[in-house]
């Protein structure tokens, strides 16, 4: 790219950044793809590639059309009127940056050649682990750089310049001499700068790539590896368009039809998508909404409350590894018909195996939800983990079973107990209601909690992990989905909390409490001193009538508790040596990061049971174990049948001491007072530790 090369003597070996970039692409191709996948990728790429001066490449229109992404510039321009899904330019900007890896400062934006496409697919599908042994945490920084568009030169101009100069060498090097490089400025987002925050932020991913090529010195000339501050930012419009695309494609499976999620969207679906997108944007600081999203805010948002946000990009770009033009099975079948004497030879599948039929994530039966919808489920998939092996609820085939609905089953703790206390599996609690502000304006809000343990009384902590950093799927989670995205992760020291700090607490007198401190029982009259008290980073209280919910979000000043303050992850909290250190290190990206109490008038309260996939459950069984796990739905129905039989049996108990109707009613009254029959059989205190 406008750089000259020189040699200092016989046998001197010239090394350029472009050559190293190609070497890394070849290594990625050989190590991260199967021969079959590589064949399909080549067919997809070269059958559509443009040619300019001997360079085969893809432009934005080709990429958007192949991926099925709405793009106002090409034939895939089936974008809606509001343009919310017009994400083609955003995706193309991302791949143009990632294609230059690990020399973004020198080569970005790159022409989307075959080598660049190989690196893009490996990075976005996280297949680089087969070549690079470290650097997973640096992926967030890489994604930020690919999205940053504030403070850069026009992307189109740079792409044109890159295409014209793509055959020129960028640098020169020789053994025993200093390596010097002259190259274009590149993106300002990659310029080295001093880090005033004192935060260690090594480019582990890029460093690992150069280590694999024995080219560390060249990397040091390309960019600093010790500390980097990104001066550029992501514009709100760019991030909004990307969020809308990720929201609608979250359920996408490998080899699934992309257009099913990106086209033909109704106005009501677009409205719910935009509501959830704006909720996530509202979690950013006001300064970010004006001048763009800085790296620090972006990194904190992703790492603490949206760890699986970019998961939909994996199946999206895996589409490049399957070509509809290739059908080896059909060719071999025709050959066998021409040669009947040929022996049948077992052959591998000609195409990547298609995904098994996927059961609906939301199971039918019970009731129609007035809260949960596909868009809300996509929002949940960005941060909710139900298994350690495959965290994403769409990838691990998690199913949600309707357990309780206040709209369907009534606003009664008796009904809640009957449906929820008999559910012996993890669950999700969702509440939709209205908050009245000081100006008497009503605002719809949706909150919830992920509870990995069943709602039952248990004095055993054996189900909790005792590791320093517990698996996220075993920790509870308190969250707000709208109007401001807020996530309060479970404390890694959950098992060491006092017995009066259960995850959930159920009482017919005080209602439902999640993440609260429970006062000791007393015979005195019920008062404020005997109500559950908020603790830790957040708590949720629901009155016995299921009419009012109180959400308390704290900055950590309430001491230890079940939940961490917003903006703190379980991993970072495990490194804190004390509650004081944890509170001092709290730096939330959420607008709710201060002591706030929201009183919510409940419109609807729902509980959804979590059912893991049968194949995943089998993998979690210990080796050699043939014990079948009874389905949670079957268990609940068996419990209901048992209770029905017991109730029927108790009806025939003859408590009459004389004759007449009065004695019969007196006998039944005694049974109800004892809690054997009637609604009172569900009374009492039940809690979960």
UniProtKB/Swiss-Prot annotation:
It is found in: Cytoplasm. Residues 173-201, 332-359 are annotated as: Disordered. It comes from the Eukaryota. GO terms for cellular component: cytoplasm. The keyword Transmembrane does not apply. The keyword Transmembrane helix does not apply. InterPro entries: TLDc_dom. Residues 343-359 have a biased composition (Pro residues). Its main location: cytoplasm. Residues 370-611 form the TLDc domain. Keywords: Cytoplasm. Coiled coil: none annotated. May be involved in a process influencing telomere capping. Belongs to the RTC5 family. This is Restriction of telomere capping protein 5.
